[in-house]
């Protein structure tokens, strides 16, 4: 069913606004995926701070003009599902990666992060980014290990000094 011009303008404005605030964007093709599975994907997306949207290709191209995501324009062919990550740059990629494991018809076309085009073959590059909490936990463990190592070296130096004094 054709959209009226005002409806198209509204869609372009909504998608453009969503793109301005996004940390990353993932483009996928959901042909052949059951409606119930797509509903579950949308639910999981909302829980993870990801906006999922099906947009006509010409409207998507117009909406992404002048944004860092313009590099994705070449991937808009066939049904296009856009996912905008707002809380964590890898959230949409991680979500789509997990979803694609269970849905053989679901295909990630491409993604973009900080204006850089990333082909679908490199999905893991973004999907494996640690979350903020994971990054803090890793940093804390490294700092904890470093301080323990420093203590061991200090005790070893103290032991060596005592042995030299005794000799």
Swiss-Prot record:
Forms part of the ribosomal stalk, playing a central role in the interaction of the ribosome with GTP-bound translation factors. GO terms for molecular function: large ribosomal subunit rRNA binding. The gene is rplJ. Belongs to the universal ribosomal protein uL10 family. One of its GO terms (biological process) is translation. CDD domains: Ribosomal_L10 (cd05797). Gene3D superfamilies: 3.30.70.1730, 6.10.250.2350. It comes from the Bacteria. Disulfide bonds: none annotated. GO terms for cellular component: ribonucleoprotein complex; ribosome. Part of the ribosomal stalk of the 50S ribosomal subunit. The N-terminus interacts with L11 and the large rRNA to form the base of the stalk. The C-terminus forms an elongated spine to which L12 dimers bind in a sequential fashion forming a multimeric L10(L12)X complex. InterPro entries: Ribosomal_uL10 (IPR001790), Ribosomal_uL10-like_sf (IPR043141), Ribosomal_uL10_bac (IPR022973), Ribosomal_uL10_bac_type (IPR047865). Pfam families: Ribosomal_L10. Keywords: Ribonucleoprotein, Ribosomal protein, RNA-binding, rRNA-binding. This is Large ribosomal subunit protein uL10.
